Structure formats: C-alpha cells, structure tokens
Amino acid sequence: MAVLDTDLDHILPSSVLPPFWAKLVVGSVAIVCFARSYDGDFVFDDSEAIVNNKDLQAETPLGDLWHHDFWGSRLSSNTSHKSYRPLTVLTFRINYYLSGGFHPVGFHVVNILLHSGISVLMVDVFSVLFGGLQYTSKGRRLHLAPRASLLAALLFAVHPVHTECVAGVVGRADLLCALFFLLSFLGYCKAFRESNKEGAHSSTFWVLLSIFLGAVAMLCKEQGITVLGLNAVFDILVIGKFNVLEIVQKVLHKDKSLENLGMLRNGGLLFRMTLLTSGGAGMLYVRWRIMGTGPPAFTEVDNPASFADSMLVRAVNYNYYYSLNAWLLLCPWWLCFDWSMGCIPLIKSISDWRVIALAALWFCLIGLICQALCSEDGHKRRILTLGLGFLVIPFLPASNLFFRVGFVVAERVLYLPSVGYCVLLTFGFGALSKHTKKKKLIAAVVLGILFINTLRCVLRSGEWRSEEQLFRSALSVCPLNAKVHYNIGKNLADKGNQTAAIRYYREAVRLNPKYVHAMNNLGNILKERNELQEAEELLSLAVQIQPDFAAAWMNLGIVQNSLKRFEAAEQSYRTAIKHRRKYPDCYYNLGRLYADLNRHVDALNAWRNATVLKPEHSLAWNNMIILLDNTGNLAQAEAVGREALELIPNDHSLMFSLANVLGKSQKYKESEALFLKAIKANPNAASYHGNLAVLYHRWGHLDLAKKHYEISLQLDPTASGTKENYGLLRRKLELMQKKAV
C-alpha cells in the first residue's frame, strides 16, 4: 500500500486537528461561504428545470421521471437536451412536496448542506490522496496526512467557482454527482484493507458497490460515470504501483525482467479492471438506449468552436477553452453565469495573442505529467498522478473530445475537477515549504487565499440571489455575450420596464443578428406598444431564420391579426401548430381570429382544443362562455361555465362570466352567489359590482342594486354603461318615492 511521506505533511503551513474537528471546521466554513444564498430566488435555469417542470408535481407519475430529461421533456423528443438526471429531479420533487410548493428557501438550504457535506467528505478523500491507505488491525482506515487533508479540504470548501453549483438550485445535479462520485472512490479504497482475510470475496463486494455508486452518480449527472476511470487509475498506479519510468528504462535496456512485472501477472488487478470495464460499458449502453433518438442537437451559438469547418480551428479553440477553465480554477474572480454567444470570440489565426494561453496550459500540464509518471519519488508520483486524475478525468465529458457539448465554458463542470486543483495546490505549498525558510510568508499566502476566496464566495452568492444582480454582474465579464443582454432585457420586461428592455433586446440582436429569441421578445413588446410594422418585420425575420420556431409564428399571427391581415394570421397560427402540435395558447389566439371573422363554430372548436390541451386555460373557457352568451346559447354557455369551474374552481373571471349567464336565465339566487364569490376574490373589479347591480336591478332588490352601482362607479367613474343604469335606477327610485307620497 502507499505510505505517508511524513516530511511533506509536517512542513505544510496548516494545523493538526483530530478528524472530527477538522471535518467540523471544514463543514462550517463551507456553510459560511454560501449561506448568503439561502433566501435567494429561483434564477436562470431554475425556471425551466424547477418552476416550469411538471415532473416536480404530484400529478406527474413517479415513473415518468425515468423517461424524461432534466427539464421535464420526453427523452424521445427531438428537442430534448438528453440530460438524464432522474435522481436529481426526484430530490427536487421531494423538496417541492416538503416545502408545500415552489418556495426557494428549502431548495437553497439543501444545496448549501450538500456542499458542506461534500466538503466534509473531502477530508477523508484528501487523506487517502496525500497519505495513502493504511488500516488498523480492525480494518479501520488511519487518518493520514492531517495537515494536507485539512488544507486541501478548506481550499475546496471556499472555492468561488462552486457558487453556480451551490447558489443555483439546478447545480444540485453536480453536487449529488460529486457526493456519490466520492463515495464510490472511497468504497473502491475499501477493497484494499490490509486486514482483509476474505481475499477476493470482500474485495469484489466493495468493487461492485463502488460501481453501483458510480451508476447512482451518473443518474444524478452524466459526469458521474468517470469515477470508474479514476478508480482504475488509482488501482493501477497506486495499488499496483505501476511505475512508468521503470517500464521505460527496462524497455530501452531490453530488460527481460519486464515480463515478470507484478502488475502484469496480477490476476486480482485484471479481474477488477474487467469489472470496471464491464460496469462502465453497461452504464454507457443503458444511457445510450435511454437517449432514444441519438445525441442532442445544439446550435452554433451554444458552442461555436464545434461548428468550425477547420479541424485546426476546432482544436485550437477547444484548447483555449481548457485554458480558460484552468484560469477559473487559479483565479476565480472572473465569473459569469453564461459564456456562450460571442462571450469568447473564436481564435481564427495563429497571430491571435490568446494562443499564449494554450502554450502556458500545455507547458504546465506536460511538466506535471512528466513529474507524475517519471519522478523517482514514489510519494510525489502518487500525489501528482491522483491530482491530475481528479483534474482531468471528471472533466472529459465536457471536453468536446467524445461528443459536442452545449456550452463553451461552464463553471458548474469544474466542481469535481477542482478536487485535483486543490491536491496540486496543496502539494505546491508543501514543496515550497520544503525548499524555503520563509514558512511564515507561505502561511500568510495560504491564509490570504482562503480569506480572499471566502470573501469572493460571499460576494458571488449575493449576485446569485436574484436574476437582476446575476445578469448585470455578467456585463463586465462578457459584454459581447448576446444572451447576457437578452436576459437583462427579459428581466426588465417582466418588471414592466419596457423602454429599458427594448434597449437591451436591440443590443442582443445587434451582437447576434440571428438571435431569434431576442427578436421574438422584442417583437412582442413592440406589438404591445402598437408598433406593429416593426414587430411584424422582426417576427418574420425570426421565422425565416428558424422556420420551426412555433412561438414566433404564433406572435407573428397575433401581429397580422392586429393589422387586419386575417388570412396571413390564420396561416401563421396553422404553421405554429404544425411545429408544436400541443400548443394551447396558439389555439386560443386562433379562436380569437375566428371570432373576429364571425366564424363562431371554428372559434369554439379552437378554444375547445385549447382547453383539452390545457384544462386550466381560463381565457379559452371564458371566451367560449362569452361567445355562447352573446349568441343566445344560454343553456350551452351555462354547461361550459359549470364544466370550467369544476376544473378551475377558484377562477373569479369564470365565476363572473357564468354569473352573467345565470342572471340572464333568471337563476337569480345562484347568479348572486357566484357574483359575491367573484367579488370576494377580486373586490376591486368595477365590472363585477356593476353587473351584480344589474342583477339586483332586474331581481327587484333596488337598494342592493343602488349600493353596488355606487361601488362600481367609485372604482371606475368612467364606466358609461354603469352610469346609464345607475341613472335609470335613481329615476325609478324617485318615481317610487313620489308615488309613495
């Protein structure tokens, strides 16, 4: 087994704490770093993965989670992102149930506690990485390298690059994946207890358990499968003591003893490698079958380098992305929620100064790899090898080497690779301490890094508390990112600041002239401001760029309807439905078009389709009731109204519409009850009081009619119909008073 190099651990500028206290300190520090995010909102991707994800609600059968992607879409759909994380979604569903709805505090607290727990687990992981494996006679693993493991765990706990995973609720996928990844690694270590008397049987159990935990990690996030590769590296280079330098020397000298290398004759190692390979192959096969229609389809704006025609351009830019990821680990002050859409322009020429970053990255990596594989110091080899293994292997799924990914740089994918970074940094501090007498200076540097990173975590957690702060924080990092401007515009539009939203949407379109979502949203705002001509031009361009953009087709239809271009509007609605068959809002708007054209049957059919697809679509129900009421079909209007209220019992607008129908049918008592219920739900609706007054007027309850006419006119003094009815009532009351005299 690997043994501890006591010299390295003793000279590190770190305290020695018993395991319990070390874990308590690390866990507490991890909580302090990200506690500020506990009461934050759902931000950015949280909206799609949580708030709009029906898989979290009880109406969706639990079994559907195994057939849906992370965002709630069916995996078999061509539009699915194929991100299969059912166990993560299950935890969201439990959170939703325990919180009694979409209350973000519970979701954020779980994320913070998960990061704290993972940081605590890191103390054990780093103890193995730095100190090796040693067990007591009772089979308990010794806590070796206490200084190194504490320092590395603290560096991990306070790393600001983790903010996206902890403060963004969807980052739970990375947290859960990391948790089971580390448990799998520690479980694999259990297979090599020196006190193991049962030999292969016990070892096989722990190897199989490790593979199972790797599968669980993969069901939290795809990255989890890479733990099998890390376990294999650990087994070969640490347990098997495979020495590349020794092998190379024997090959060069044609040493016949090469044939007798223990690793090559180790049946146990070959058996474990077979298990790991078989387990990994099985997991990949199942994962591929689940994907259904093949890999996801990404666009050029998601990952521009992967669409470059030249293989050289692709390779250069991929390596530049790697250097940016390395820089985020080294200097995590430059953070952004999204790095796509022009944030990182492509390197297209060797004269681009950014190629220096590639050279620096590979200079460092090659140096570390040479030291890791060829150093005569076995302890140094082990630490560097495992540090590089943790740095590189979990990052492979995001590297674009095996398949195209849907992002340029993503801070969340660095959660596990940062373990390797912390190993290398801690080893570097140890090496510096060993070769210099300025121990206090190194200790001050270490404390400075911990303090600055903690401060950055607190500040960055604050930026993740709301979308406005998060999006605006990105402007200084990625001013060329069209998506940053788009998201700021969307946030402003949601708050009603249309003028500012238009400015940001226009900038997003300027930065990316093919940004159809920005065109669609800008077109919608212009439509609401009655700037119909420009709205039509933008929406027409959007559907020209992306012909299957159903939402843009529907919005184009709305604009064309407003311009009285009814045939074009109908065609646009039909095209939208063609590309998105289950589109209740489009059926609703199509029904409005038919109503404007007095095609009443077609309108009713369109609205009925909307309610079939979305039973809670109150606008469609309301329009059906009103149309049937206006055309004199009171019995049918009443039936539709009752059907609607059974599905949406607390919708006051439906109560109001049905109450009007019942009043015309002289069902005064039932109509009154519905009016009063609607008014209780929405007491400031002038029309509710006005129509209830009309009911009382017809019914002969003139004092009550007078009361509600007056309330209605207080709420809306400009309502001409109410004024006229109130005047009629007053004249009637005056006549009655004169007759009484």
Swiss-Prot record:
GO terms for molecular function: ATPase binding; dolichyl-phosphate-mannose-protein mannosyltransferase activity; mannosyltransferase activity. Residues 1-14, 133-141, 187-198, 246-268, 376-382, 434-440 are cytoplasmic. PROSITE patterns: TPR, TPR_REGION. GO terms for cellular component: endoplasmic reticulum; membrane. TPR repeats lie at residues 482-515, 516-549, 550-583, 584-617, 618-651, 652-685, 686-719. The chain crosses the membrane at residues 15-35, 112-132, 142-162, 166-186, 199-219, 225-245, 269-288, 355-375, 383-403, 413-433, 441-461. Pathway: Protein modification; protein glycosylation. It is found in: Membrane; Endoplasmic reticulum. It catalyses: a di-trans,poly-cis-dolichyl beta-D-mannosyl phosphate + L-seryl-[protein] = 3-O-(alpha-D-mannosyl)-L-seryl-[protein] + a di-trans,poly-cis-dolichyl phosphate + H(+); a di-trans,poly-cis-dolichyl beta-D-mannosyl phosphate + L-threonyl-[protein] = 3-O-(alpha-D-mannosyl)-L-threonyl-[protein] + a di-trans,poly-cis-dolichyl phosphate + H(+). Glycans are attached at N78, N497, N609. It is an enzyme of class 2 (transferase). It is a multi-pass membrane protein. Residues 36-111, 163-165, 220-224, 289-354, 404-412, 462-741 are extracellular. Keywords: Deafness, Endoplasmic reticulum, Glycoprotein, Membrane, Non-syndromic deafness, Repeat, TPR repeat, Transferase, Transmembrane, Transmembrane helix. Its main location: membrane. The keyword Repressor does not apply. One of its GO terms (biological process) is protein O-linked mannosylation. InterPro entries: O-mannosyl-transferase_TMTC, TMTC_DUF1736, TPR-like_helical_dom_sf, TPR_rpt. Its EC number is 2.4.1.109. Transfers mannosyl residues to the hydroxyl group of serine or threonine residues. The 4 members of the TMTC family are O-mannosyl-transferases dedicated primarily to the cadherin superfamily, each member seems to have a distinct role in decorating the cadherin domains with O-linked mannose glycans at specific regions. Also acts as O-mannosyl-transferase on other proteins such as PDIA3. Belongs to the TMTC family. It is linked to Deafness, autosomal recessive, 122: A form of non-syndromic deafness characterized by adult-onset progressive, sensorineural hearing loss. Sensorineural hearing loss results from damage to the neural receptors of the inner ear, the nerve pathways to the brain, or the area of the brain that receives sound information. PANTHER family: PROTEIN O-MANNOSYL-TRANSFERASE TMTC4, PTHR44227. This is Protein O-mannosyl-transferase TMTC4. It comes from Homo sapiens.
